[in-house]
Amino acid sequence: MNNIQVAIIEDEKPAARLLEGMIKKLRPQWDIIKIPGSIESSVAWFASHPHPDIVFLDIQLSDGNSFLFIEQACPTSLIIFTTAYDEYAVRAFTVNSIDYLLKPIRQERLEEAIQKFEHVTSKYNQKLLEQNDLLEVL
């Protein structure tokens, strides 16, 4: 999968750099965007830019809980949560989330989450192609 746009929303710069490095190691062809790790900045960014394909989202941001960001920004992106807190896992799957990574993130778990994203998007793209084929027949 090429031309995948990835956003990292993380308020701790060392954690953001570490996650970026891990993603680049696994998928060097992906474009990574680091968005400031606050709800306010993230909502503003999403209001003025095309939404990326996937967002790695920390749950506790500098100005609150990332579920508020989701309510305000309504991202169309698939979300992989990255957090040190396991108590939000159930709620995470009520939004556009496909995985939940506990910090410290292990490379193997990140690879599993990325593969899940790739599987979901390939199935979605396959369905779109099938629908387009049906429309052409009509």
Q: Which residues does each predicted region cover?
A:
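Non-catalytic signal-transmission and effector/linker regions of two-component phosphorelay proteins
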Residues: 1-5
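Conserved beta-strand positions in the Rossmann-like core of class I SAM-dependent methyltransferases
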Residues: 7, 33-34, 80
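Charged docking surfaces used in two-component/phosphorelay signaling
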Residues: 17-21, 25
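Acidic, metal-coordinating helix/loop segments flanking the phosphotransfer/catalytic sites
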Residues: 20, 35-54
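CheY-like receiver
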Residues: 44, 52-135
